[in-house]
């Protein structure tokens, strides 16, 4: 299972990319807006494009960039503009009627599409049939309403395997390291997570205790 970072922060991407385990990045309008607001910079079309190019050059893998349009025609136009920014860009579309229409057209043009905001296996099936390269079920948000995000992911992965659909599953809306473990065990192709969760994957108190003990023992015997 590949590991993606769900962020628009170049600093966070550079930090995790240095570990040698980062395969891609997912962004959304909220994440991008936060980055520009924090810098006090205007979010112009040129600045946004430059920021996406910098992300692509840093990660070296797929970078999902989401449209803000709600109607298919506008989604297609915006998707083309996003895809033209860099070859690594994957156009992110909402799983709606208009999103499906746009997905069909963009994928027919050879533009990769990540269908997002998926909360059912049927939505994933529709997205795959519309030509999506990726489908993104939201584990955490499903858990939030007392449903089972893991069960949703299991259904989608199994359905795609049974139907032999050429689409990758991105486990999204990941809230904690257990979601990552669950996604890997259930057969997700990719898990995308916030920077904080990525850092938590590496942390374990016994690792810190063990390292401290090794160093203390070494200090006792070294020349």
UniProtKB/Swiss-Prot annotation:
Q: What class of enzyme is it?
A: transferase
GO CC annotation? cytoplasm
The UniProt entry's GO biological process terms, in alphabetical order, are: carbohydrate metabolic process; pentose-phosphate shunt
Does Cell wall biogenesis/degradation show up as a keyword for this record? no
Q: Could you tell me the EC number(s) of this protein?
A: 2.2.1.2
Q: Which UniProt keywords apply?
A: Cytoplasm, Pentose shunt, Schiff base, Transferase
MF terms (GO), sorted A to Z: aldehyde-lyase activity; transaldolase activity
Active site residues according to the UniProt entry: 92 (schiff-base intermediate with substrate)
Record PROSITE patterns: TRANSALDOLASE_1 (PS01054), TRANSALDOLASE_2 (PS00958)
Q: Which domain of life is it from?
A: Bacteria
Which pathway, metabolic or otherwise, does it act in?
Carbohydrate degradation; pentose phosphate pathway; D-glyceraldehyde 3-phosphate and beta-D-fructose 6-phosphate from D-ribose 5-phosphate and D-xylulose 5-phosphate (non-oxidative stage): step 2/3
The reactions it catalyses are: D-sedoheptulose 7-phosphate + D-glyceraldehyde 3-phosphate = D-erythrose 4-phosphate + beta-D-fructose 6-phosphate
Question: Per the record, a Pfam family?
Answer: TAL_FSA
Where is it mainly found?
cytoplasm
Q: Where in the cell is it found?
A: Cytoplasm
Keyword set includes DNA damage: no
* SUPFAM superfamilies membership: Aldolase
Tell me the protein family, please: Belongs to the transaldolase family. Type 3B subfamily.
Q: Which PANTHER family match?
A: FRUCTOSE-6-PHOSPHATE ALDOLASE 1-RELATED, TRANSALDOLASE
Please give the function described in this protein's UniProt entry: Transaldolase is important for the balance of metabolites in the pentose-phosphate pathway.
Instruction: Name the chain's protein.
Output: Probable transaldolase
What phylogenetic lineage does the species belong to? Bacteria, Thermotogati, Deinococcota, Deinococci, Thermales
- Gene symbol of the encoding locus: tal
